Amino acid sequence: MCEDSGADMITVHGRTRDKIYAGEVNYAEVERVKYAVHIPVIANGGIFCREDAENLMERTGADGVMVARGAMYSPWIFAEITGGPQPDRRALVLKQLDDTLALFGERFALVFMRKMAAFYTKGKRNSSALREQLFMCDSVEKLREMIEAAEF
């Protein structure tokens, strides 16, 4: 239907709406779409690292992947997936802080970047204690110091 209507590409999420973020990606359904059309199919669902992207493409025959939540935890995932040079993660987070501050002001930047820094440090050494400190942080200056000292 999409292809017949002129679509140049289709993106398919491997979970139904009722599954939201839980459960396994339905590789068979993505693969079924891939082989039912003659246009590129981009697969989405459960991509948090390069291996996830490769697995999704291998198991479905998809032409590419779309990253969603995985990019919230790891905005550097795109360089990882493509094999490109890895960015300086700390510098990237500090730039995001500066950009958010410039666009939205101190209050929003503080709340937003505490949340984002917590995402970025998940699973790292001492990340639980760091997240507690992040959420108690009450100034952009202190937040900047914490980001400069954190492991990403």
PLM feature spans:
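Alpha/beta catalytic cores of nucleotide-metabolism and tRNA/nucleoside-modifying enzymes
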Residues: 1-9, 21, 28, 32-43, ...
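Short, small-residue-enriched loops and turns at beta-alpha junctions
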Residues: 16-23
